[in-house]
Regions:
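Extracytoplasmic/lumenal domain signature
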Residues: 1-145
Length: 145
């Protein structure tokens, strides 16, 4: 299998697939066959380089993306991509602009997934992601989905 750009992320596994990002700006999902060989692959163009390892949970893929500006600039167009996966591919749910390039894997917390935040008597299924970003002075960002 050939990828667009260097693979700098960790390869993560979820439900029969491996996922990784590239400096060429792509997220890949590759099927793992029962015998350990690769099966069908699909990719998604993130629009900027990605070295952070993706996090996959309940049909969502979360990954940090470098913007088109300077890598460590606070106004470089950096964002955190929230993607939706289906059997046939990957699509963008939304992007969240952030103040610096997120190069590390996020921490996903399900601690409040069963909370009812809108008062309708049903759990909202909300997860929280925490990740670092690289822009002076540095920082930690939180996203809920």
């Amino acid at each position: 299998m050939t990828s667009h750009g260097d693979i700098r992320s960790t390869i993560v596994y979820n439900n029969g697939y491996v996922y990784f990002t590239t400096k060429g700006g792509y997220l890949y999902r590759v099927q793992m066959n029962a015998d350990g060989t690769f099966g069908t692959a699909c990719s998604y163009n993130l629009g900027g380089m990605a070295t952070a390892s993706p996090v996959v949970y309940k049909g969502r893929i979360y990954v940090g993306v470098c913007g088109n500006g300077e890598q460590f600039s606070s106004d470089g167009g950096h964002h955190f991509a929230v993607l939706t996966e289906t059997a046939s591919g990957i699509s963008l749910a939304y992007n969240v602009s952030i103040p610096g390039y997120p190069q590390a894997a996020p921490l996903l917390s399900t601690a409040y997934e069963n909370q009812d935040y809108n008062g309708d008597g049903q759990a909202d299924g909300r997860v929280y992601l925490y990740f670092t970003y690289n822009a002076k002075p540095g920082g930690i960002y939180m996203l809920s989905d």
